[in-house]
């Protein structure tokens, strides 16, 4: 049967976020399990119920789904709430401060939200790799050398000789250490990761001699990374299983590409822009001139009357698309060179040209 979260908190279905929070705080203080030592089981169940209602109604998206369907999926395809689903421990901590006057948890919460899991440790590694635009154009292979922590091959990451582990004598397998303050039902508990086992709950019966019980050894890696054709700046290449190792797990290495600027070419997405100089005669009369980018040669057709700054496109001669289908275009921007020194004959011809210009609206009509 679906739960009526509004009824549980005692609020109207149109209640504001502030009304919902206020109702939860009042009920949480009323039903805190440490205040009901003679009926703790009922108090714990009631406290969990109002916390479930608050988790749903205080979240706009969860509340919207609940209002439409009458239930909320807390993960795993089911609607059963547990404390792993609760995301408002800071609100409960504020309530604890009001009740007990200190920033402490409770026996009731000693197992929720406090244990640090090694699963949350980021074991991935990241490194930048500089490549040229030409290398990005053709694709290439690059060697990378680096140092990392790898799983000890002798103990397989357990840190124990022959892989034999025993229950931690300090935390008795919980991975936690608790400090209790106060007496009776005003007990206040802080929970920390066990210093002996590091939160694992088990320790080596005898330390592995190769890694001295750490489960990892330092190794120097020398690997080859394949750079794909058409690689882009900031592209991340994942090398599986070459990250840091800890607690029997290993992360990945991410190689982040940095493409250096080319002195002749500018990349615009998958197009390439090339500045090409031509002389006055080629611009005026038109011409066919050879051009080259990297190892690729093309014939550039200059139309008659080409102006400075005109862009001529060679379709499909740009960067290869990263997905492997087709390429961008090569854009050739024309720069018309004006000679700084002229022979007498050249001067005479230019004067004749200007004489023609005086009788026409433009040089070329």
UniProtKB/Swiss-Prot annotation:
Q: Name the CDD domains on file.
A: DnaJ, DnaJ_C, DnaJ_zf
Q: How many and how are cofactors bound here?
A: Binds 2 Zn(2+) ions per monomer.
Give every J domain span. 4-70
GO biological process per UniProt:
chaperone cofactor-dependent protein refolding; DNA replication; protein refolding; response to heat
> InterPro entries, per this entry?
DnaJ (IPR012724), DnaJ_C (IPR002939), DnaJ_domain (IPR001623), DnaJ_domain_CS (IPR018253), HSP40/DnaJ_pept-bd (IPR008971), HSP_DnaJ_Cys-rich_dom (IPR001305), HSP_DnaJ_Cys-rich_dom_sf (IPR036410), J_dom_sf (IPR036869)
GO MF entry, a single one: zinc ion binding
Q: Which SUPFAM superfamilies has this protein been placed in?
A: Chaperone J-domain, DnaJ/Hsp40 cysteine-rich domain, HSP40/DnaJ peptide-binding domain
Instruction: State the compartments where it is located.
Output: Cytoplasm
Residue spans annotated as Zn fingers (CR-type) read 139-220
Q: What does this protein do?
A: Participates actively in the response to hyperosmotic and heat shock by preventing the aggregation of stress-denatured proteins and by disaggregating proteins, also in an autonomous, DnaK-independent fashion. Unfolded proteins bind initially to DnaJ; upon interaction with the DnaJ-bound protein, DnaK hydrolyzes its bound ATP, resulting in the formation of a stable complex. GrpE releases ADP from DnaK; ATP binding to DnaK triggers the release of the substrate protein, thus completing the reaction cycle.
Family assignment from sequence similarity = Belongs to the DnaJ family.
What is the protein's quaternary organization? Homodimer.
Domains: entry comment: The J domain is necessary and sufficient to stimulate DnaK ATPase activity. Zinc center 1 plays an important role in the autonomous, DnaK-independent chaperone activity of DnaJ. Zinc center 2 is essential for interaction with DnaK and for DnaJ activity.
Q: What is this protein called?
A: Chaperone protein DnaJ
């Amino acid at each position: 049967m679906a739960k009526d979260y509004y009824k549980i908190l005692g609020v109207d279905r149109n209640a504001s976020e502030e009304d919902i929070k206020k109702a939860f705080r009042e009920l949480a203080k009323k039903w805190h399990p440490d205040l009901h030592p003679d009926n703790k089981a009922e108090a714990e169940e009631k406290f969990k119920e109002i916390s479930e209602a608050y988790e749903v109604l205080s979240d706009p998206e969860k509340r919207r789904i609940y209002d439409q369907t009458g239930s909320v999926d807390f993960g795993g395809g089911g609607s059963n709430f547990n404390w792993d689903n609760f995301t408002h421990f800071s609100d409960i901590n504020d309530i604890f401060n009001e009740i007990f006057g200190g920033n402490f948890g409770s026996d009731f919460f000693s197992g929720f939200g406090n244990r640090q899991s090694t699963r949350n440790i980021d074991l991935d590694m990241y490194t930048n790799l500089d490549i040229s635009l030409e290398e990005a154009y053709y694709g290439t292979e690059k060697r990378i050398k680096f140092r990392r922590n790898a799983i000890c091959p002798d103990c397989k990451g357990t840190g124990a000789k022959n892989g034999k582990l025993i229950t931690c004598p300090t935390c008795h397998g919980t991975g936690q250490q608790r400090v209790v303050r106060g007496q009776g039902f005003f007990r206040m508990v802080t929970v920390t990761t066990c210093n002996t086992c590091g939160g694992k709950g088990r320790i080596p019966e005898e330390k592995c001699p190769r890694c001295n019980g750490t489960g990892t050894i330092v190794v120097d890696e020398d690997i080859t990374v394949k750079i794909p054709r058409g690689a882009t700046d900031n592209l991340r290449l994942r090398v599986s299983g070459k990250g840091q190792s800890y607690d029997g797990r290993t992360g990945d290495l991410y190689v982040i590409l940095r493409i250096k600027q080319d002195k002749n070419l500018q990349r615009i997405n998958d197009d390439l822009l090339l500045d090409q100089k031509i002389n006055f005669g080629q611009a005026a009369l038109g011409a066919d001139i050879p051009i080259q980018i990297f190892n690729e040669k093309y014939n550039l057709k200059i139309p008659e009357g080409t102006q400075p700054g005109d862009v001529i496109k060679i379709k499909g001669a740009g960067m290869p698309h990263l997905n492997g289908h087709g390429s961008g275009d090569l854009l050739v921007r024309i720069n018309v060179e004006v000679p700084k020194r002229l022979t007498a004959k050249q001067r005479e011809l230019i004067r004749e040209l200007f004489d023609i210009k005086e009788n026409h609206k433009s040089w070329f009509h």
